[in-house]
Design a protein with these regions (language model features):
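Bacterial Sec-dependent N-terminal signal peptides
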Residues: 1-26
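Glycan-recognition and catalytic cores of secretory/periplasmic carbohydrate-active enzymes
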Residues: 23-213
Length: 213
């Protein structure tokens, strides 16, 4: 009986070992499909807006005021002034573009650079260079702390993936402008210059500091 039990236990152990060794391999094909879809969308966008000298910011969508009130547990009178106007019917689902001075302007060229890095697709690289160069005037801009977002995502990735002699100068000049927003008395970088704020400082400042190093 003991021998039978031992044999059964041995057999179960062997089956467990074999099953552990023959686990199916993870299917990562969905990653490639996602990357292919993202790359195609990035290229399509690049082609469609190339003559505008603008950058894609978001897709225009509407909002349900009742839903917002339920989520915020507040009356709409307390926050409706802070909402953007509802897009018109012909604007819904369309791209919202922005100028090079918008705080999100570096994200699109940055996305092109990352897609190029992952695919090796030279068409993506060409578009990345074009949309990065579009941000050249930002090197003279002093009106926001978001210079890190704007320039690191674009020129920072360009320096990493396709370096040339002009990129470092753009990044240094922009970094100098970001340093210029530092106030010795307060020991902080001023976040922005609009509105009625005295000296706004938000956590995003930390994410822009990488440009200084």
């Amino acid at each position: 009986n003991n021998m039978k039990k031992n044999l059964v236990l041995l057999a179960l152990g062997a089956l467990t070992f074999v099953s552990c060794q023959t686990q199916p391999k993870e299917d990562y094909s969905w990653i490639k499909k996602g990357l292919d879809a993202a790359s195609a969308q990035l290229q399509l966008t690049a082609e469609e807006i190339s003559s505008t000298n603008m950058l894609p910011r978001s897709i225009r969508t509407g909002y349900d005021m009742n839903f917002l009130c339920r989520q915020l547990e507040r009356d709409s009178l307390t926050f409706k002034d802070s909402l953007r106007a509802q897009p018109t019917a012909d604007q819904l689902g369309k791209r919202r573009l922005c100028s090079v001075y918008d705080w999100t302007s570096g994200f699109y060229p940055g996305s092109l650079w990352y897609a190029y890095e992952l695919t090796g697709n030279d068409t993506l690289k060409t578009w990345a260079i074009q949309y990065t160069n579009l941000l050249n005037p930002v090197r003279y801009y002093t009106g926001t702390h978001d210079l890190g977002f704007m320039v690191n995502c674009s020129y920072g990735n360009a320096e990493r993936l396709a370096p040339n002699d002009t990129i470092a100068a753009v990044m240094k000049e922009t970094a100098d402008n970001l340093c210029g927003r530092f106030n010795d008395s307060i020991s902080a970088i001023r976040s922005w210059d609009f509105g009625t704020w005295n000296f706004p400082v938000i956590i995003d400042n930390m994410m822009n500091l990488d440009l200084l190093f």
